[in-house]
């Protein structure tokens, strides 16, 4: 079984602290590595997490404030140093193309990796490669800023007991799967009679925004929602002034979106006790947890029928 988890490489907003690095988040899912918003120092955090950066094949930048992208150049150079052979797909707001280029080409090195750019200029479907569907929504942060939703493809699952009851095994299973029906002992058995469609899980990221409908929409029905909560509710005016969320507001988004699990991140350096964020959010959305550097959260499969 492939690894399915979310590792918090950093969870601080704007500036790192003694205990929290700039934000960066690695999602390992079905043999792929999705890196979100690599801030300064991300490469070193991989060492502490005991994860090889070569697992990365997709990088997402929500916007081009420094704490969300300053680690991009060093990560690309590290992948180049490691001579990774797979393409590195990079998704970012199209309006930030010049900043992407500055980060990518900010120093002298011979780039040998294959970087595939996906500048996003409109909301909606960005890519569907048959394994994952990637969607974007524009959030409210004063500059162009994107929330992401990644959904795995639906898969068909056989009901083993139904196969046994009908005497279907071995090559007959393959025939049924390929043809959609099977004639056995004078009876026609259809694929739907002995199987069901498992709905693909969904991961959503809402980083740096005021409360808005787009944040709810991109988080809709997320199996796992990673959401910023820069401030506690007692500082909600600061959150409004800087276009951020409080823990309470993040929880309201998760609740309204019908998310299954919420991970809070992107904490202001003014706070030491992150449990306060968890406590505040859980009054509204019980299945809430706080990020902390180098913590790994399991991304558990949810077997829902489509």
UniProtKB/Swiss-Prot annotation:
PANTHER family per record: ZINC PHOSPHODIESTERASE ELAC PROTEIN 1
Lineage: Bacteria, Pseudomonadati, Chlamydiota, Chlamydiia, Parachlamydiales
Domain of life (superkingdom): Bacteria
Job description of the protein: Zinc phosphodiesterase, which displays some tRNA 3'-processing endonuclease activity. Probably involved in tRNA maturation, by removing a 3'-trailer from precursor tRNA.
UniProt name for this protein: Ribonuclease Z
Keyword Ion transport: no
Binding site for Zn(2+) 1: 63, 65, 141, 208
Subunit structure comment from the entry: Homodimer.
Family statement: Belongs to the RNase Z family.
Named cofactor requirement(s): Zn(2+)
Molecular function as annotated in GO: 3'-tRNA processing endoribonuclease activity; zinc ion binding
Cofactor detail note: Binds 2 Zn(2+) ions.
